[in-house]
Amino acid sequence: MFSNLHLPLNPIDKVNQPPVYYLQVQDGLIICSGLCWTTAYILYIRQAYRDKSYGMPLVCLCANIAWEFLFGAAIPESAAQVVSFFPWFVIDIGIVYTTWKFGREQWKHAPLVAQNLGWILLGGIAGMLVMFWAFLKTYDNRYEAGFYLAWTDQIIVSTTSVAQLMSRNNTSGHSWGIWFTRWIGSVFAELIFVWRYWNYPESYPVAATHVTIFLFIVTEVADLTYPFVYASLDKKEKKKLK
């Protein structure tokens, strides 16, 4: 009964008409990635209330909101994108709120930022929306444009999360759960494109470009650096409590 079930076809799959097993593996990876990232976003909000802080760096939060609004609501390419990205957009609004609510304390060393954090968030989101829209209008291949925007956003999330831990010198706003679900979600996302390229290289050349390989490698290096930095800071914090 369920052997032929799969998510609605994306534009490339409509042309290729791949076998059901290909679609189901692809769908499984999409669903796993989506569930992991959804969990990570919820954990960001929970940790914000626990620590009275925020964990997602400002630049990548603004980029996330812009990307998820564009591809989850404004100009989605498929029903699968709406199902995946619009819920993230809704949850991300909660992250924006907790960042605004608790972020001012984190920026008390920079009063100009602390006093204008709401405007900085609004301006950052608006700026990212315009920049992403301009990139999509400039790039002929919308699929590849969306891909590069998504993975540029991803590399920003991964690298700035490590940088934020190091600059704060504490783990406030962060947790092992956030890191693990975010990292595994990214691994599943990478595997989606590996699977697609393995089966249809002529349809997904973007997955094997030098830029893509760079984005994937740097993302993994940053994500695998994070736990070492977090563990070091967590150990110091626990020593202080003794």
From Swiss-Prot:
Membrane topology recorded in Swiss-Prot or TrEMBL: Multi-pass membrane protein
Signal peptide (UniProt feature, chain positions): none
Subcellular location: Membrane
Lineage: superkingdom: Eukaryota
Coiled-coil parts of chain: none
Keywords per UniProt: Glycoprotein, Lyase, Membrane, Transmembrane, Transmembrane helix
Pathway annotation from the record: Secondary metabolite biosynthesis; terpenoid biosynthesis
Root EC class: lyase
EC number: 4.2.3.-
Glycan attachment sites: 170
Residue ranges of the TM segments: 25-45, 55-75, 80-100, 116-136, 175-195, 211-231
A Pfam family: Pyr4-TMTC
Family recorded in the similarity comment: Belongs to the paxB family.
Function: Terpene cyclase; part of the gene cluster that mediates the biosynthesis of the phthalide-terpenoid hybrid 11'-O-desmethylfendlerol. Within the pathway, mfmH catalyzes the last step and cyclizes the prenyl unit of 5-O-farnesylcyclopolic acid into a drimane-like structure to yield 11'-O-desmethylfendlerol. The biosynthesis of 11'-O-desmethylfendlerol begins with the NR-PKS mfmB that forms 3,5-dimethylorsellinic acid (DMOA), which is then transformed into the phthalide 5,7-dihydroxy-4-(hydroxymethyl)-6-methylphthalide by the cytochrome P450 monooxygenase mfmA and the hydrolase mfmC.
Protein's UniProt name: Pyr4-family terpene cyclase mfmH
Species for this entry: Annulohypoxylon moriforme (Filamentous fungus)
